[in-house]
Regions:
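A charged, aromatic-enriched C-terminal amphipathic alpha-helix characteristic of glycosyltransferases
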Residues: 153-183
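Short alpha-helical segment that forms part of, or immediately flanks, the ligand-binding pocket
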Residues: 85, 106-113, 126-127
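Short hydrophobic beta-strand element within catalytic cores of glycosyltransferases
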Residues: 94, 107-111, 117-121
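Conserved catalytic-core segment of nucleotide-activated headgroup transferases in glycan assembly
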Residues: 4-68, 77, 81-84, 89
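Short acidic/histidine- and often glycine-rich active-site loop of Leloir-type glycosyltransferases
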Residues: 122-138
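Conserved acidic donor-binding segment of nucleotide-sugar-dependent glycosyltransferases
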Residues: 135-143, 149-156
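Glycosyltransferase donor-binding loop in the core domain
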Residues: 26-32, 103, 137, 167
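Short Ser/Thr-rich beta->loop micro-motif in glycosyltransferases that lines
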Residues: 79, 96-102, 123
C-alpha cells in the first residue's frame, strides 16, 4: 500500500526525448544525500563518459561542495527547481547512492513515476516492489555505477510503457483507494 501522494506535476511528466544527462535529486541538508553525492564524485565521476551532463537539483548543498563541483565542466547545480519532473522524465536516469536511511524514498518513487530509471544502492529501493526492477538499477560498487551510466540503453517507448504501468500499479495500491473502500 502506498501512503503518500504523487503531485500532478509528477503524473504529467512524460518522457519526450532522452537528453544525455543524469540527475541527482534531493534535499541536500540531509547527510545521507550529501554523503552519497560526495561518494559518487570521489568514486565514479572521474570514470564516467564526460559527454553526459550531471544536473543536481535541490536546496541546501553545502557551499564547499558547490565550489568543488564547479571544477567539473559537465556538472550543473540548479538548486531549487519549481517543477523538476519534466527534466527528470527526459533524463537518462536519476542517481541515488544512499548508504543510510530508512523507508521508501519519495524521490525514487517520483522518478520511477516519471518513467525514469533510478540507479542506486539497495537502500534507495527499500519498500518498493521488485516487479519494477528493470528500472531499479541496483549498484553497490563504483564499477557497477560506471558500467550502468556508460551503457544504459532503455528506449523512449519502454520508458513510456513503464510509466503507464508504474502509475497504474501506484493508483491500484494507493492508500486513498483503501480508505475510500472502507467508507
Amino acid at each position: 500500500v502506498t501512503n503518500f501522494f504523487l503531485d500532478r506535476d509528477v503524473i504529467n511528466a512524460v518522457p519526450h526525448r532522452l537528453k544525455k544527462q543524469i540527475i541527482f535529486f534531493g534535499k541536500w541538508t540531509r547527510s545521507d544525500n550529501t554523503v552519497g553525492l560526495q561518494w559518487f564524485f570521489e568514486e565514479v565521476g572521474a570514470y564516467m563518459d564526460k559527454s553526459i551532463k550531471i544536473i543536481i537539483i535541490g536546496t541546501g548543498l553545502p557551499v564547499e561542495m558547490v565550489k568543488r563541483l564547479k571544477e567539473y565542466k559537465n556538472v550543473e547545480y540548479r538548486g531549487f527547481v519549481e517543477n523538476p519532473y519534466q527534466m527528470i522524465a527526459d533524463s537518462l536516469l536519476v542517481v541515488s547512492p544512499l548508504f543510510s536511511g530508512a523507508g521508501v524514498k519519495v524521490k525514487v518513487v517520483e522518478s520511477l513515476a516519471c518513467g525514469t530509471p533510478v540507479l542506486g544502492t539497495s537502500i534507495a529501493f527499500e519498500g518498493i516492489d521488485k516487479k519494477f526492477k528493470k528500472f531499479m538499477l541496483e549498484a553497490e560498487v563504483p564499477e557497477d555505477y560506471i558500467c550502468c551510466i556508460n551503457s544504459l540503453n532503455i528506449s523512449l517507448d519502454d520508458r513510456k510503457q513503464f510509466k503507464e504501468s508504474f502509475l497504474k500499479n501506484y493508483n491500484e495500491h494507493s492508500i486513498v483507494n483503501f480508505v475510500t473502500e472502507k467508507i
